[in-house]
Amino acid sequence: ISVQHVNLFQTHIKPCTDCKYCHVHNGCPLHDSFENIAGKLDEADVIILSAPVYYLGFPAPVKAFIDRTQQFFVRRILFKREKMAHTKQGVLICTCGGSDLSAIEALKAPSEMFFSVFGAELSETVYLAGTDLTPEERRCNRMELIEKEMSK
């Protein structure tokens, strides 16, 4: 088993400008570390996307990377210029400072689309909310959730 870890916060991936280059050509006119990372995802059997939640969304470096996968969506899904096998597993791991579990719902659609352009299905989601809370606050939140479940 080989594992490769990429910290998108340590890359300088330019954001997609919606120039439509990928509608006519394979690839993107923006050249940065995106190509190398995307190539690794193409070769992977399992893709794990792990990120904190910022304002019900992915942080800027992750969002920029996901947006740049538009070229694969256009090539593989929209225009079907490239065949793709759906044989991979996608795993989403997120942390959220707040305790609102609705944040995970906001990330599911972009995550599913992201995984799909690499031939993966979102097979597992791991979500840890309340990371900004103290241990006592987390305990109280758990007790509130248990009480809500028991009152149903």
Residue ranges and their predicted role:
Residues 78-123:
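Short, glycine-/small-residue-rich phosphate/pyrophosphate-handling segment
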Residues 1-74, 126, 130-152:
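N-terminal beta1-alpha1-beta2 submodule of the flavodoxin-like/Rossmannoid cofactor-binding fold
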